[in-house]
Amino acid sequence: MDKYNLIIGSHVSLKANDFFYGSVKEALSYGANTLMVYTGAPQNTRRQPIELFKINEAHNLLKEHNIDLNNLIVHAPYIINPCSSKKYVRELAKEFLIQEIERTQFMGITKIVLHPGSCLDQDEDIALKQVYTMLNEIFATINTNVVVCLETMSGKGSEIGINLKQLKTIIDNVDSKKNIGVCLDTCHMSDSGIALDHDSFNQYLKEFDAQIGIDYIKVLHINDSKNPRGANKDRHENLGYGTIGFDNLINIIYHPLLNNIPKILETPWFDFHDQSISLYEYEIKMIRDRKWFDIKYKLLVGNK
């Protein structure tokens, strides 16, 4: 078996004045070799011109550190709901997602993660059809190499994308197969009811491969969960402090079928001495060492 190629990073900020260049610097400070960004605030449509993003500087810094641009991820804004019951909302979502895909491509990134949406008062089948119809319209409108990665969801409210059947329905009906993929989120999977112990996750991947195809998995979000399995809550926890557990997460991260696939941390920041600090540097070290330690305790007692 080939040596495992661990591609590990986290969500990082993208803000003035350094923009994308600053995002890369932040990722490097955590010891990461990938990253995920939003191209603007995830809760609104306001966006800075992409020309301000210092893209060349970011690309040069990535090259200096031998980081493959193809492993970087953009996350689409939360406000995009492809299966809204309101047509004008779906039209706005489509136009905004087209802009986000084009911004992703301009940055040289090839993957954008998308929440499939919430069907609200609609029938599930109608909602699923609206998602793949929108994606087909988008890929018929623009020529892009960007892959839209449907994120597995927790089942909070009326979210879709919570099981293989729903994901399969969308993917089967997207015409441009090169532009569609899946992002597995471990917190969302557990909160939706999927068991993530060693044997259960092996079985899940077998079922995924049989129903959809393992090659559609393009990225993983690695998060522990504050909730019991099946809670449908979506509350992320730091690695080893939640109900999934560090050993189960390490098994997922280093699973041989998931080699060469980017893994992205979205774990909470830690409230420490009247400030909030990132634990990504420590969590990435734990992942590389495959050994957990109680970083919150060590920070609190002043022993790093």
UniProtKB/Swiss-Prot annotation:
Swiss-Prot/TrEMBL GO biological process terms: base-excision repair
Pfam families found in the cross-reference section: AP_endonuc_2
Entries under CDD domains matching the protein: AP2Ec
InterPro entries listed in its UniProt record: AP_endonuc_2 (IPR001719), AP_endonuc_F2_Zn_BS (IPR018246), Xyl_isomerase-like_sf (IPR036237), Xyl_isomerase-like_TIM-brl (IPR013022)
Binding site for Zn(2+) 1: 75, 115, 151
Keywords tagged on the record: DNA damage, DNA repair, Endonuclease, Hydrolase, Metal-binding, Nuclease, Zinc
Cofactor requirements of the protein: Zn(2+)
Catalytic activity: Endonucleolytic cleavage to 5'-phosphooligonucleotide end-products
Molecular function via GO: deoxyribonuclease IV (phage-T4-induced) activity; DNA binding; DNA-(apurinic or apyrimidinic site) endonuclease activity; phosphoric diester hydrolase activity; zinc ion binding
Claim: Disulfide bond is one of the keywords in the record: no
Enzyme class: hydrolase
Cofactor remark from the record: Binds 3 Zn(2+) ions.
Entry binding sites for Zn(2+) 2: 151, 185, 221, 266
Domain of life according to the entry: Bacteria
Positions that bind Zn(2+) 3: 188, 234, 236
Known EC number: 3.1.21.2
Transmembrane spans: none
Similarity field: Belongs to the AP endonuclease 2 family.
Its biological purpose: Endonuclease IV plays a role in DNA repair. It cleaves phosphodiester bonds at apurinic or apyrimidinic (AP) sites, generating a 3'-hydroxyl group and a 5'-terminal sugar phosphate.
Name under which the protein is recorded: Probable endonuclease 4
